[in-house]
Amino acid sequence: MNHELALHVIEQALQYGIKEFCVAPGARNAAFVYLLAQIPTIKVYYWSEERSAAFFAVGRIKATHQPIAVVTTSGTAVAELLPATIEAYYTSLPLLLITADRPRRFRLSGAPQSIEQVGIFSCYTILEKDLAENEFFQLDQWSGRGPCHLNVCFEEPSKNDNQECARSFSMGIFTPKPILCDSHLLDEFIQKCQFPLVIVGALNQNETTPILSFLRHLKAPVYLEAQSGLRENSLLENLRIESVEDVWNCSSQHGYPIDGILRIGGIPTARLWRDLEETNNVKVCSISENPFAGLTNGNIIHTSLREFFKNYRLSFKPIYSFQAWKDANRSYQLELLKLFEEEPLAELSLFHLLSKKIPEESKIYVGNSLPIREWDQAADWTNKHFQVFANRGANGIEGQLSTFLGLASPEQNNWAILGDLTTLYDMIAPWVIHQIQPLKVNVVVVNNSGGQIFAPKFAHLSFLNSHQLNFKAFADFWGWEYDCWHEIPTTILGSQTSRLIELVPDPSATDRLRKKMQRM
């Protein structure tokens, strides 16, 4: 009985186009484990811990642009999937959650490994099915624009779960459901705003060309976050605003009082985005693959970015005069570069120098909290064709190393830049690395002795989670190469295997740099 039910679920997943499964084996999902092991056309990653398995799947989705499944046993194993499910929900990723469950008669009984799994993910799945013996469904009901939960009720595991499966399986092709929209909200925004600023957040690689063309035709000032893939593009240099520190005052003082924000792509990391909650006279229009405005106000055009900008034509061509602001902005950047030279051991300076030394065409994953902000602020402007990624759906620090390993590519140098607390959150992540093709992996752990993002805001020391730990033992535990840097070496060679680099900023230099920047 269990075998037939498992067979139906896996057939649906394969027909949908799923070719990779992250499996945390247990007694209740044994029928899935045995069945998946017999299918030669798929890749199965085996995990001992479900939370990291799910974040690894998030990384695989980002790398392949294909749906990935996570398969768990029953009980609290299912609850471990919630953080990654939330991340996938807010970034519209096709994450399939296949959770084994005890039979329905055990619900609300408190029996061992019986929790209420139906509805456990609340609003964070866009489709949920609860299945038992002789119950069938079609997975093509799933739009693929967010997580799906299949809860599968099995009887007690038995020898019959390990049946040989002689059937051949047909593999489908993943085709997400199209999003239909019109462009009148963008037309209206362009017509009403005299002083717009465009902010480009996270984009997929196939979206950058039509968006680049749109930006060059619009000719409005644009702030490009690293995840856009356009940050260092020389074709946008004449439009590029490189710093948004004190952006409202600086733009107004130089004759360009911002009256509109056009957001393209993911929700921005920059502080100016949060400022919009308290800025009532600024119109906001967002164009995104994700259906979230990212604010309590503003319009959202939920659409396929590639198709939208391939077909969009400006109804008229406005003229924006922002050269004075751009010149002042560039002067600020030059002053900042001088400060990096004055304080080369400060944390922000180390980010700048690291960005100059990482090999061209590397794939870079930037962790949440300080690293993503410091990369956007300090990375060099030379176009080295980096691909920059992050988990910015819910901005959490869990699962970052697992996501990076899922994202990593055998054909590229792969770099993760993570905070110390972020790394401690995900120490099981390297479990999977021997199951992946040989990778060139460099994990930079910025060890600033705790959560320094809170240092300027909160006086109570408990916010910092201060520590005196180092990460050599972590590297040794997993058999990784280890380096400790207090400054950036003149030459950096990408590792040919797996390497952990502990980057230790000078706290006094970091504090001096922060104070100098406040006086700029």
UniProtKB/Swiss-Prot annotation:
Assembly and interaction partners: Homodimer.
Any single GO BP term: menaquinone biosynthetic process
Cofactor binding comment, as recorded: Binds 1 thiamine pyrophosphate per subunit.
The protein's annotated pathway: Quinol/quinone metabolism; 1,4-dihydroxy-2-naphthoate biosynthesis; 1,4-dihydroxy-2-naphthoate from chorismate: step 2/7; Quinol/quinone metabolism; menaquinone biosynthesis
Cofactor(s) for this UniProt protein: Mg(2+); Mn(2+); thiamine diphosphate
Family: Belongs to the TPP enzyme family. MenD subfamily.
Gene assigned in the entry: menD
EC class: transferase
Enzyme Commission number: 2.2.1.9
Species of provenance: Protochlamydia amoebophila (strain UWE25)
Reactions listed under catalytic activity: isochorismate + 2-oxoglutarate + H(+) = 5-enolpyruvoyl-6-hydroxy-2-succinyl-cyclohex-3-ene-1-carboxylate + CO2
GO molecular function annotation: 2-succinyl-5-enolpyruvyl-6-hydroxy-3-cyclohexene-1-carboxylic-acid synthase activity; magnesium ion binding; manganese ion binding; thiamine pyrophosphate binding
Protein name, as recorded: 2-succinyl-5-enolpyruvyl-6-hydroxy-3-cyclohexene-1-carboxylate synthase
Keywords: Magnesium, Manganese, Menaquinone biosynthesis, Metal-binding, Thiamine pyrophosphate, Transferase
Function: Catalyzes the thiamine diphosphate-dependent decarboxylation of 2-oxoglutarate and the subsequent addition of the resulting succinic semialdehyde-thiamine pyrophosphate anion to isochorismate to yield 2-succinyl-5-enolpyruvyl-6-hydroxy-3-cyclohexene-1-carboxylate (SEPHCHC).
InterPro entries in alphabetical order: MenaQ_synth_MenD, THDP-binding, Thiamin_PyroP_enz_TPP-bd_dom
Listed Pfam families: TPP_enzyme_N (PF02776)
Superkingdom per UniProt: Bacteria
